[in-house]
Structure formats: C-alpha cells, structure tokens
Amino acid sequence: MTSLTKVVAAVAGCSAIVNGAVIPAENGLHTTTLQTRDTAKGTGHILSKREPVTIAILTAAGTAAVTAIVNEAVSAAAAFIGDISNFDAGREAFTVQTTETMMANNPDPERFQAAACYNKAFSVADPANIDGQSSVEFRLGILNTDYECMYIAAPNQFFTEGDGGLINLSFTHTDRCTFDQETADLTCV
C-alpha cells in the first residue's frame, strides 16, 4: 500500500503544480487560467445522457472583421466540444478552445496580445484597446451561462471582478502579457 500512497501523492502534487499554471504552446502563446475546480471527485463509471452544446452570439461590438473572427472561434469551439454530459467540463473546454482559436487566427498580431473569455464582471484600463467583444450564451440542455469573449490590444489591463478557474476564465496571450495569480488579472504592455 505504500507504493499506492506514493503514486497518489505524486499525482496530487502534479495536479497542484498544474493548477493556475501558464500552459505554453509551440507557437509561443500561453493559455492562462486559475483552476479552482475540485478534480479529486471523479464520476467513475457513471453512465449519463450526452447532449450537444449550443452556442449563441447574443451581442457583438467592435470592428466587423475582428468580431467575425471571434464569432468563428466560438462556433469552432462548440463544434470541437460536440456532445458532452458534463456542463462544467464543457464550459472549461469552451473557454480554452475559444481563446486558443482566436489567437491562432489573430487578425493583427502586432496589436492584439491576448484573447479572453470570462463570465463574471470585469473592467479594463483602456476600453478603446478591446475589440471584437461578443456576448456568448453557452447552453447544455437546460443549463446555460454567458461569456464575454474579446481581443485585448496592448497596452491594457483586464481586471477580473469574480472568481477564475477554467470554468469562468481563459486568457491566451503572448509574452507581452503577464497573469497575476493572486488577482487573476492580465496586464499587456
């Protein structure tokens, strides 16, 4: 049993290291989150009904070209997620997939240093340096929530006014941005 205890401790340690980590990609972009969801509770072999994720763009503001790219990223994320049975897992996949797709299709890499999706209250230092902001409804069966997804141009700061975690927040950004683990805020220079 001692070896099993060591394996469990090692896995838990690795999990703690990953939580709140910056995940580097081969293209030099980083997806940053503040993961707070309890991953120790597994569903085991529970069978459940799988349902398709539906996404609706509620409102959009910004230049037409940039807003179109945000909307395409949102649609691609919904297609990528497909049919799922867990609302929280779907939300986590949605936030990460959307911001990564947005940055992979960045219309102006010199200007836009980050993509964000967040479903809590937020503010920014310079609203003029936000583009493509879209209000998105994420729905699975009777459960739903909404997100704001947008590009962040530098210089700017994105201030979170709620909790983080992949379920609520994802930033994909260049090295010109830094993520504050304590506040879950992003600063781009």
Where are these regions (language model features)?
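Fungal secretory targeting signals
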Residues: 1-54
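Intrinsically disordered, low-complexity segments enriched in small/polar residues
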Residues: 11, 18, 26, 40-42, ...
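Compositionally biased, intrinsically disordered low-complexity regions
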Residues: 15, 22, 30, 44-46, ...
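Amphipathic, membrane-inserting segments
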Residues: 87-189
